[in-house]
Amino acid sequence: MKVRVRLAPSPTGTLHLGTARTALFNWLFAKKEGGTFLLRIEDTDIERSREEYINDIYDGLQWLGINWDESPTIQSERVNEHKQIIKTLVDKGFAYKCYASEAELDEMRETQKRNGLAPKYDNRHRNLTPEQESEFIKSGRDPVIRFKISDEKLISWNDLIRGKMTWSGKDLGGDMVIARRAPANSIGDPLYNLVVVADDSAMKISHVIRGEDHLANTAKQILLYEALDLNIPVFAHTPLILNSEGKKLSKRDGVTSISEFKKMGYTSEAMANYMTLLGWSVPEGINERFNISEVSEIFSFKKVNKASAKFDWDKLNWLNSQVIHEMSAETLLENLEPLFKENGWHLPSHEWGINLVGLIGPSMVLINDGVDQAKPFFEEQELSEDGKKQLEIKEAAVILKFILEKLEDTDAASFSKEKALDLINQATKSCEVKKGLVMKSLRAALFGTLNGPDLIQSWVLLSRFSKDRARISRLI
């Protein structure tokens, strides 16, 4: 069987983490099997679909390194084909027009609830006589079109993740609406389960890989495949992604879209790495820190768990820090320089920028951390409480005055690590204080705090702007 898989997002919002994980599993499976990964935009919800969301989906997938093999299919462009299929189902007796009003359906559901029953359509208009149908039309009622589902029907399939699955027709909510309300002489807008079957068949999809929240849809869609005498694809239902409280991850949890993760400073490599781990168990001997192109060679649904995956921020942050620490200084600077420019910061030289990222990179977890850590090199900082206390020590002013006098006789462009160390040693000896006092006082004066990366390297970088002199002089 030639493997053809697809991602079918709805452009009613930005690319969600769960959708991106589904895309990743489809892409990995296609690569492993030498197959084809396709993209279908399910834009039949005209009111909520937006062009900017389509672009966000494209951008998010490409940022993650997930590229599709053929031009994207736009579902709304096939509406005539969908309606023709619905007409065929009606003509063959698999579907019918239902004239029940929304008020009648609401009353039906309320009655079922009062009687302790699960709400479901009671198939009341499945067998209308021509006379009854004529009366509904005369009264001005517009029908939906429903697909017949027998309560006695058992639907089974072998799921690549969950094994043998069986659903009963009585658990599917009654006869299924496949077209929205429209005048009786027309067909309304086709609905999800019908158009998915039509498009997956037209695209020759061999495997449908999606979340476990689609299990009931799969049972309904298999009935449609059978009624239309179409080849039924292989199904695989991936585990849900849960939040820290064990509930399905949603917008209420804050960051859920790929574009938001990108803005926060997560790397595409770490995101793809982590999303693969949300439901897929790493085979023995394989490190959890990997590139998805490597995993595509070993990916298997046998290693995808049935149990839901819990989103772990600590794990994602660890992976992101690993990716950053593995970056060359050149690559890290490429990521940071646009952010520096957004803040109005300009590098005195490329070499200076390389030295800066080499200094701050080891402590970065997010790309955006580099902005916070680089800020003291571009902008003078307010004194922290510990910085104030340090500079209140009476010897601090003497130390800083000594260092400033020596700096005035030093060329900023040639100031080096060796000269900085020599100057600290001179201050220690001349001011008759401990070296630690000199270094703490100097750090407080230069950067406003007692914490930060290596002081000597930081000082050398700051001296390229001659800002060390200005910052020390204002405190004396």
UniProtKB/Swiss-Prot annotation:
Question: What superkingdom heads the lineage?
Answer: Bacteria
Keyword Nucleotidyltransferase part of the UniProt annotation: no
Could you tell me the EC number(s) of this protein?
A: 6.1.1.17
The listed location of motif 'KMSKS' region is: 248-252
Biological processes per GO annotation: glutamyl-tRNA aminoacylation
Q: Which chain positions lie within coiled-coil regions? A: none
Q: Which family does it belong to?
A: Belongs to the class-I aminoacyl-tRNA synthetase family. Glutamate--tRNA ligase type 1 subfamily.
Function as written in the Swiss-Prot or TrEMBL entry: Catalyzes the attachment of glutamate to tRNA(Glu) in a two-step reaction: glutamate is first activated by ATP to form Glu-AMP and then transferred to the acceptor end of tRNA(Glu).
Its name, as the record gives it, is: Glutamate--tRNA ligase
- Its source organism is Prochlorococcus marinus (strain NATL2A)
